[in-house]
């Protein structure tokens, strides 16, 4: 225990976390359509139905990418995958800066989604930093991503207020392209300077990646409870996506004000909340800390459902947005920390991250299309349908976390499960 407490972040580790955070921000180009829904829709002259279709098709592509991305990240070096991914992001961001319209948006966002990034990046960090620092590493990863994203968001807010949606989307995409280029260089330095002692030790045949071990992973209850619990918490992004147009349409906020709020929720909170989330998870445990963020999710949705949808109540609506965004930013570092907490085998770590990401994005494959059509058909009632479904989803997340909490107290983590399966074999 004393050795764990003495573990400290080195300059090299801080550099690795910052570069990966910058890269995470650069991949935000594929999230423009979610995080800056209003201005992207206007810049490309799209309808809510078309936006929903793009989001759904992109989500299907993401599910496919997460499936093969995690597996190849446990077979191919993270550096190789990340080099290809960042070069692709750089080129695609430049193309997206031309505001290409509906059909081209589908193609570009699908290409974004099909390019693996998250799983190899997490694997790179996992093999260059000690596991006892995982909470701190992933918390600061999100924070650095928020800091660099804040710069992008503020520049976009200025562009919206000064020049309108078309120019602001162009500015955003160019900045993402530049960040991709910088990260591409940084990844080469990290891979070159990584110390041998931080890399995994030589593994026996039973400890290497294999489809037999992968089959054990997908049968492990602890893994599924993490994957599903994180997925139900992640569904808050669906509600958060539609809160921005809701604020403009029903609460009387200007487009520039909503863009500024989007910047705060996407970037300012991303810089602050994950640091607290990592500290809180280290203090009381990752599983127990997740109750707080699921509670924020539920409180946010209850507020928005019970207040009158008029301009007089816009402050309550803004508070609801910030509360839900805080829930999502607090949940984010836990998605990886929980996998460490349940002692996921390192030879399957990227595969587990991939399965978690794949399960997490399955609702996106149909939810955005359904939500967009519901809003177009029912207006205000359509928005409320979205939030009512969100209540059911967050309750499901609480159930998963309660069961996981009980299993962890009984010592039934992934290492225990793999040992049991090994004895049976």
Where are these regions (language model features)?
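Extracytoplasmic gate region of multi-pass secondary transporters
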Residues: 33-35, 145, 149-153, 220-270, ...
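C-terminal transmembrane helical hairpin of 12-TM major facilitator-type secondary transporters
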Residues: 285-335
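Flexible cytoplasmic inter-helical loops of multi-pass small-molecule transporters
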Residues: 189-212, 411-422
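Cytoplasmic helix-loop-helix junction between adjacent transmembrane helices
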Residues: 108-144
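Cytoplasmic membrane-interface "Motif A"-like loop-to-helix N-cap segments
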Residues: 74-85, 282-296
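Conserved MFS/SLC helix-loop-helix module at the cytosolic interface between two early adjacent transmembrane helices
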Residues: 64-100
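Glycine-rich segments within core transmembrane alpha-helices of 12-TM secondary carriers
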Residues: 135-160, 357-368
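A late C-terminal transmembrane helix in Major Facilitator Superfamily
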Residues: 343-379
């Amino acid at each position: 225990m004393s050795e764990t407490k003495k573990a400290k972040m080195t300059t090299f580790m801080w550099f690795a976390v910052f570069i990966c955070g910058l890269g995470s921000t650069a991949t935000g180009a594929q999230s423009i359509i979610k995080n800056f829904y209003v201005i992207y829709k206007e810049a490309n002259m799209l309808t809510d139905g078309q936006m929903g279709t793009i989001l759904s098709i992109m989500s299907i592509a993401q599910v496919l990418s997460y499936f093969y991305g995690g597996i190849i990240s446990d077979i191919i070096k993270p550096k190789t995958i990340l080099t290809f991914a960042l070069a692709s992001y750089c080129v695609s961001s430049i193309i997206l800066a031309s505001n290409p319209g509906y059909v081209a948006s589908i193609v570009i966002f699908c290409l974004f989604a099909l390019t693996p990034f998250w799983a190899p990046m997490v694997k790179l960090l996992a093999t260059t930093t000690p596991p006892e620092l995982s909470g701190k590493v992933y918390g600061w990863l999100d924070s650095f991503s928020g800091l660099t994203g804040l710069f992008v968001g503020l520049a976009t807010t200025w562009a919206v207020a000064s020049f309108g949606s078309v120019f602001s989307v162009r500015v955003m995409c160019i900045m993402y392209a530049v960040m991709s280029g910088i990260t591409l260089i940084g990844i080469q330095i990290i891979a070159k300077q990584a110390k041998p002692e931080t890399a995994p030790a030589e593994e026996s045949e039973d400890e290497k990646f294999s489809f037999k071990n992968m089959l054990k992973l997908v049968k492990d209850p602890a893994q599924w409870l993490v994957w599903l619990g994180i997925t139900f918490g992640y569904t808050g992004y669906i509600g958060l996506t539609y809160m921005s147009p809701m604020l403009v349409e029903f609460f009387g906020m200007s487009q520039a004000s909503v863009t500024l709020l989007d910047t705060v929720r996407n970037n300012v909170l991303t810089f602050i909340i994950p640091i607290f989330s990592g500290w809180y998870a280290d203090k009381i445990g990752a599983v127990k800390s997740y109750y707080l963020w699921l509670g924020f999710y539920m409180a946010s949705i209850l507020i928005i459902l019970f207040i009158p949808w008029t301009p007089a109540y816009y402050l309550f609506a803004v508070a609801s947005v910030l509360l839900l965004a805080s829930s999502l930013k607090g949940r984010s570092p836990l998605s990886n920390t929980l996998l460490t907490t349940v002692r996921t085998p390192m030879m399957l770590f990227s595969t587990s991250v991939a399965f978690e990401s794949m399960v997490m994005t399955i609702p996106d494959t149909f939810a955005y299309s359904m939500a967009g059509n519901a809003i177009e058909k029912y207006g205000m009632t359509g928005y409320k349908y979205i939030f009512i479904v969100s209540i059911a989803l967050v309750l499901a997340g609480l159930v998963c976390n309660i069961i996981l909490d009980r299993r962890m107290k009984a010592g039934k983590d992934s290492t225990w499960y793999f040992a049991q399966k090994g004895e049976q074999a």
